Amino acid sequence: MRNYTKWDYQPHAIEGVPESFMRAYSTMVTEPAGPIYMCYDAWLQEEKLTCEDLAMPPANMQKAPAPMGADPDTLSIMADVILDAKHPVILVDFIGRQPGNFEKLVTLAETLGCGVWDINNSLAFPNQHPLCISLDHESLKDADVILGIDVRDWEKPTHKLVSTTREVTSHVPEDCVWMEIGFAELEMSAWAFDYGRYQPKQHVALGDPRLAMPELTKIAQTKLENNTALVSARDARARVFSDRH
């Protein structure tokens, strides 16, 4: 069981039960969220309760840590790279698991003028949006920047596998700049290989996408203010993606 969970525990005394539940819940819902496993020995369950003042958690306690923000300096660099690009693409995977991320990604993509490829492990972007390029491998052939947000398997959408020969070829140009926002190696397990081939990135920001996306949007909006050249380039990029939709 330990190989499949973030944390497992078996209390050996009734006094440890409330604390184990507090730790289990906090561990489970802290991003990257994952399952926990708790079990109780039959002896402990059947033993007569003799403790008269079992300490329970206070009502005003914070049940889990606040989400982790991404480094603003790295986000600023990412904004510069994307705004200077000709054909930037945002690759998204699991961000749809948090309420509100759907709308945050739409705002981010429209602000930056990026095409968006939703890997569809969790619905993250509307497929009727003009910037949606999911399953359009031709759009990746011109990508000069790819920003992955909460992506686990980079190779699946960006490469082609010939099943008969096991040959793998990339849809993306060799000089493409790769960047990442998400939990990266925090999601890794020493046992489970539920991740794809490692993709080297030029810029990586460790942080929760629910905070990083609006922050990156805000940074980009500041850079776009009173800069007609950047705005014109952004709008031109968006038209290229929308014309393919």
How would you name each of these model-derived features?
Residues 19, 69-70, 98:
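Structural/interface elements that position substrates and couple domains in central-metabolism enzymes
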Residues 15, 39-40, 174-245:
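Phosphate/pyrophosphate-binding active-site segments
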Residues 22-27, 53-55, 102-113, 162-170, ...:
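Short, solvent-exposed amphipathic alpha-helical segments in soluble enzyme
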Residues 92-183, 187:
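Glycine-rich, anion-gripping cofactor-binding loops and their flanking helix/strand elements
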Residues 23, 27-84, 203-207, 239-244:
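Conformationally flexible catalytic loops at phosphate/diphosphate-handling active centers
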Residues 14-15, 64-70, 123-127:
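Short, flexible loop segments at the rims of nucleotide/cofactor-binding pockets, characterized by
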Residues 1-31, 142-143, 148-149, 196-204, ...:
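Conserved thiamine diphosphate
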